[in-house]
C-alpha cells in the first residue's frame, strides 16, 4: 500500500523518517499527524520509534538501516542511542559510525541484501555497513550523482531511481541489485526520490504532493499489496487486476 503524508508542511517524508521491515523511525514533531500515518499502517506489526539524532529531526538523512541493523553518525548522543536500543527489536544491531560524510541516509541506499554507497566513503565504513546490515556493498553513482541514498529508494521488491538515469544505467543497477528498477519522481516531479519516499516490502509513505501517476508507479515497482505481514494489503490484489484490464 502507498500512502501520502506531510511532516509539518514538508513533503520530504524520507528526511523525517526511516522505514524497514523490522522497525520504523519517525522524527519528533509538533503534530502527531505524521506519526499517526505510520501508526495506522504499522501498529502491532513493527515498532515505531519517536527519535532524534544528534538533537535534530532529520533522522531519515542521518541514518541508514535495514531489517538487520541501523547505522547512526557519531554525533548521536548516548541518550538517543539508548532510546533506540530500548525501542527497536533486540536482534537489530545498532552501530555508531565515525565518518566524514555523516549524513548516512544521503550516501547509503540499501535493502536487506545489497547496499549502494557513495564512492568516497571510508574503507572502514564500507566494512561496518557489510557487517552490521549484512549486505553486499557496491560503490556506485546514480545518474552521475554520488548521493545514492538521496536519488534512489529501494526495497527487496524493487527500486525507483533519479528520473534522468539512462536505460543502460538502470539495467546495470538492476542486475547488480537483482530487483526491477524504474526511473521516476515523487512529489510532483521531484528527482530526490530517496528524500521524498520511505518504503519497505509492504508499505510506502510519500509526500502529499505526489501525483496519482507517481503513486501508481510506486505501487507497481515495489509490488506493494502482493505480500504483507499478517495479510496486510491482501485487498490490493483485486485493484491490480482491475488496473491491468485497462491496458
Swiss-Prot record:
Gene Ontology annotations for the cellular component aspect, listed alphabetically: cytosol; nucleolus; nucleus; preribosome, large subunit precursor
UniProt signal peptide: none
Keyword vocabulary terms for this entry: Cytoplasm, Initiation factor, Nucleus, Phosphoprotein, Protein biosynthesis, Ribosome biogenesis
GO molecular function (one): ribosomal large subunit binding
Pfam families cross-referenced by the UniProt entry: eIF-6
Subcellular location: Cytoplasm; Nucleus, Nucleolus
Coiled-coil region list: none
InterPro entries, A to Z: eIF6 (IPR002769)
Record SMART domains: eIF6
Gene3D superfamilies on file: L-arginine/glycine Amidinotransferase, Chain A
Origin superkingdom: Eukaryota
Modified positions (Phosphoserine) in chain numbering: 174-175
SUPFAM superfamilies listed in its UniProt record: Pentein
An individual GO BP term: maturation of LSU-rRNA
Main location (coarse class): cytoplasm
PTM comment: Phosphorylation at Ser-174 and Ser-175 promotes nuclear export.
Family named by the database record: Belongs to the eIF-6 family.
Subunit structure: Monomer. Associates with the 60S ribosomal subunit.
Function: Binds to the 60S ribosomal subunit and prevents its association with the 40S ribosomal subunit to form the 80S initiation complex in the cytoplasm. Is also involved in ribosome biogenesis. Associates with pre-60S subunits in the nucleus and is involved in its nuclear export.
Family annotation (NCBIfam families): eIF-6
Protein name: Eukaryotic translation initiation factor 6
Biological source species: Emericella nidulans (strain FGSC A4 / ATCC 38163 / CBS 112.46 / NRRL 194 / M139) (Aspergillus nidulans)
Amino acid at each position: 500500500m502507498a500512502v501520502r503524508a506531510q511532516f509539518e508542511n514538508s513533503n520530504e517524508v524520507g528526511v523525517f523518517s526511516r522505514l524497514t521491515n523490522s522497525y520504523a523511525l519517525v522524527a519528533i514533531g509538533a503534530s502527531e499527524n505524521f506519526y499517526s500515518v505510520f501508526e495506522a499502517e504499522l501498529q502491532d506489526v513493527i515498532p515505531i520509534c519517536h527519535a532524534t539524532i544528534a538533537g535534530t529531526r532529520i533522522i531519515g538523512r542521518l541514518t541508514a538501516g535495514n531489517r538487520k541493523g541501523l547505522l547512526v553518525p557519531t554525533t548521536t548522543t548516548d541518550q538517543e542511542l539508548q532510546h533506540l536500543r530500548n525501542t527497536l527489536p533486540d536482534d537489530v544491531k545498532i552501530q555508531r559510525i565515525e565518518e566524514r560524510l555523516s549524513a548516512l541516509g544521503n550516501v547509503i541506499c540499501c535493502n536487506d541484501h545489497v547496499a549502494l554507497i557513495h564512492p568516497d566513503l571510508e574503507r572502514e565504513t564500507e566494512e561496518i555497513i557489510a557487517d552490521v546490515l549484512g549486505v553486499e556493498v557496491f560503490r556506485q553513482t546514480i545518474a552521475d550523482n554520488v548521493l545514492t541514498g538521496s536519488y534512489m529508494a529501494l526495497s527487496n521488491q524493487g527500486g525507483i531511481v533519479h528520473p534522468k538515469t539512462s536505460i543502460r544505467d538502470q539495467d546495470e543497477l538492476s542486475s547488480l541489485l537483482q530487483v526491477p528498477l524504474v526511473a521516476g519522481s515523487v512529489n510532483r516531479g521531484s528527482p530526490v526520490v530517496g528524500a521524498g519516499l520511505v518504503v519497505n516490502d509492504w508499505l510506502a509513505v510519500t509526500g502529499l504532493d505526489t501525483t496519482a501517476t507517481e503513486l501508481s508507479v510506486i505501487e507497481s515497482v515495489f509490488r506493494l499489496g502482493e505480500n504483507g505481514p499478517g495479510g496486510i494489503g491482501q485487498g490490493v490484489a483485486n485493484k491490480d487486476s482491475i488496473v491491468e484490464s485497462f491496458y
